[in-house]
Amino acid sequence: LVKPSEDVLEEIKYLNFDYYQVYDCSPEEIRYIKEKYRKKIISAITIENSQDLNNYKDFLPFSEIILFDSKGYEKSMSFNHKLLEDMPSNFKKMIAGNIKIDDILNFKNKEYIIDVSGGLEDISGKKSKSKIDKFLNEINKVWN
């Protein structure tokens, strides 16, 4: 949900979602959504450089998961995931930003939830079955 309006939130409130993944909202807006709609929250923090990293702290009280994504999240852009290496381990982290099959080994010893959405597409918005199969095979090789 990208800065969801009250109308959108009202329309989807009866759908059986466990989490709302929310972009471009302030911590206060996240708190409001969490309290009113009683959903678990994935708060997206966009990262371009190291100065953006500490923005997550304001969202922690209202978020079950913090998603670190690139500034161009709608365009499947990437950011330097190594910026996250010194982050504290006391909260759940999700990473996105055009993660591709070849990137999997970089995350082997990390406690990240990985959003590979754009990295598994041949055409923007359309997943590739062969890329999904290759990704799952790579995951099995790395963790087995």
Regions from the PLM with identified roles:
Residues 1-4, 8-34, 39-58, 64-77, ...:
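Catalytic beta/alpha-barrel core
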Residues 12, 30-38, 84-88, 133-143:
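Surface-exposed amphipathic alpha-helices with a cationic face
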Residues 14, 35-36, 56-58, 80-83, ...:
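Short, glycine/charged-enriched secondary-structure capping and boundary segments
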Residues 20, 66, 80, 84, ...:
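Conserved, mostly hydrophobic/aromatic
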Residues 23-28, 71-75, 110-133:
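Glycine-rich phosphate-binding active-site loops on the catalytic face of alpha/beta enzymes
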Residues 40-42, 106-107, 113:
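A generic structural signal for ordered secondary structure
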Residues 62, 89-91, 110, 142:
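Structured helix-beta-strand junction loops
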Residues 94-106, 121:
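A C-terminal functional module that forms or caps the active site or interfaces directly
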